[in-house]
Amino acid sequence: MRETADGVLVVSHDDSLLRMCGEDRLISEMTYEEIKQYPIINGRNASQYPDNLIPTLEQYIACCNKYSVTPVIEIKSIRTEEAMNLFMQLLTESQKEPVLICFRIETLGKLREMGFTGKMQWIRTVRMNASMIQQCKKYDLDISAEYKNISMNDINNAHQNGIRISVWLCRNEDMVDIFRKMGADYITYEKWNTDEVKMRYYSHSTIPRGVWHEYAKIPRHTSQNSIAAGNLE
């Protein structure tokens, strides 16, 4: 979710329209009326929806309400106080309490100060540490961790401190199964073409070595290729 130049909150992962709409301009420097001039042209089946536009956050929440879905909203950029107030107001329109995620602890802390009491996740791309745990306890946050930077010990430590763990960028079902058994509370599955990326537990390229050895409870010098997948159950 990002703020446009005229204070509209829109749903876009990227900061520009280049990848999805073919226009190399920053969302933060465009009004929403300008953004609507560029329909989405990339993505699966995009050609079947020629008038598909970058949606507003209000439209996204309305869609979630229609299908009784819990909104999960990553906050990319809120630049102004007015936009933050608008964001808080839009959250109240959701029939199910939204889950908010963000890389910036300052933004999450501000939302707590403004009265948001729902679930929030601090997105991290580094290993968990004591300072991170304390920050999460201060603002009642969970942690959203990149798969290669989380271990079973980290998950156990977080749980002991009342913190849930979300793991993202899992690339196949084997990785999902590993982190599920390690105790992850939420898992984001990046489902690719399984015929091309199908791998088992002994794949060198998919599962981080430390995570794999910890899960399998074997010495860290052991080769992944030396143990059959069935022996990891």
List each language-model region with its residue ranges.
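Metal-dependent phosphodiesterase/phospholipase catalytic core, i.e.
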Residues: 8, 13-117, 139, 161, ...
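Active-site beta-loop-alpha junctions enriched in small/polar residues
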Residues: 2-4, 14-15, 76-78, 103-106, ...
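C-terminal active-site rim and adjoining tail of enzyme catalytic domains
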Residues: 47-51, 121-233
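A glycine-centered beta-loop-beta connector
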Residues: 3-9, 179
